[in-house]
C-alpha cells in the first residue's frame, strides 16, 4: 500500500500495516458518495439533499455498526468478492462522520432559511474538504480529532490512548 494510503488509513483510526489490502478502497467509498451528494446538493441548491445527508451521517457517527455506507460496501463489494468486510468505525472516523453531519445540517438549514450566501460558503468548504480526502488522502476532521486528543492529553496531564499508534 502506498504511503499516502497508509497515512489515510492510519488517521481513520485503523492499525497500519493492515492485513486487509482492500481497506483503503473500502474507506474511500463513503467520501466518494458523500462528495457526489454534496455536488448534487450544491448544483441544485436543494436543502433536502443536505438534510438527508446530515441524517445519514449522524446515524453513522452515533450508531457505527449500522453505517449505511459501510453496509453498502459490505453487501455489494466485500461479500460477493470474498474480501474482508468493513467493521465498526474507530473514533477518528466517527468524528469525521459527525463533522460531516454537522456541516450537512448547517448547509441544509442555511438553504431553508434563505441564507444562500452562507450556504455557498459552507458548500465550498465542504467541497474543499472532500477534495482533500479524494485527491490528497488527507481527512481534515480526522486530523482535527487527533490534534484535539493530543491537546486534551497535554492539558490534563493524562495519557490518551491512540487507536493506531503507528501513525
Regions found by a protein language model. Name each.
Residues 1-167:
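Membrane-interfacial helix-loop segments of redox and metal-homeostasis proteins
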Amino acid at each position: 500500500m502506498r504511503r499516502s494510503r497508509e497515512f489515510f488509513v492510519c488517521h481513520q483510526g485503523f492499525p497500519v500495516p493492515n492485513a486487509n489490502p482492500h481497506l483503503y478502497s473500502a474507506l474511500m467509498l463513503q467520501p466518494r458518495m458523500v462528495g457526489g451528494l454534496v455536488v448534487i446538493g450544491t448544483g441544485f441548491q436543494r436543502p433536502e439533499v443536505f438534510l438527508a445527508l446530515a441524517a445519514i451521517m449522524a446515524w453513522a457517527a452515533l450508531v457505527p455498526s449500522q453505517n449505511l455506507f459501510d453496509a453498502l460496501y459490505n453487501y455489494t463489494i466485500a461479500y460477493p468478492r470474498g474480501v474482508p468486510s468493513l467493521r465498526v468505525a474507530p473514533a477518528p472516523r466517527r468524528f469525521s462522520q459527525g463533522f460531516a453531519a454537522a456541516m450537512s445540517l448547517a448547509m441544509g438549514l442555511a438553504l431553508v432559511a434563505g441564507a444562500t450566501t452562507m450556504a455557498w460558503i459552507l458548500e465550498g468548504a465542504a467541497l474543499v474538504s472532500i477534495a482533500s480526502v479524494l485527491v490528497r488522502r488527507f481527512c481534515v476532521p480526522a486530523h482535527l480529532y487527533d490534534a484535539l486528543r493530543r491537546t486534551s492529553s497535554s492539558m490534563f496531564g493524562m495519557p490518551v490512548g491512540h487507536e493506531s499508534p503507528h501513525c
